């Protein structure tokens, strides 16, 4: 009845809950029967309030989220939501966050740093471990992430088990950790859409993407 009355329009419904169990409190089966589409927000695997650094959306976690949702919602109604962001996690030994401007971030500590008077990588790590570091976290958009990768490119590695690139590098006053989302990681997630016969894709959020992003991913969006 609502669909008939709202021809040419859209209505987004967000169920309310004060439960600490997050989305599992929702009656997904009832929602799946009543709604045209159910948006599965497959991101924030590790949220910004976490006391421990972690990824935004690893491939195994996303696939598990899909499987759990399909137990109560028809596949053709499920829209896979994917992140156009990640988080910068910085464990600061000196209790101070990294500068706002990437250009002011320090270089990674290497064995050759002795010549510059900054000590060895092991010494820096020992200094960071001497007292419990303070964890700082900030959001990094897909559009801005390439500059960070370029700065620390020798330390960025692909994690096949997680389905994404990650950075774990020692800096002079702390440790920097980022689990990157990019074209490769998102394409791996997109493969799950036809695999599980889902209704389409969505991304959070518009404005976080780099130029020309939609040329490769727009065909997967719900239209």
Label for each model-derived stretch:
Residues 84-192, 221-223:
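Glycan-binding loop/region signatures in secreted carbohydrate-active enzymes
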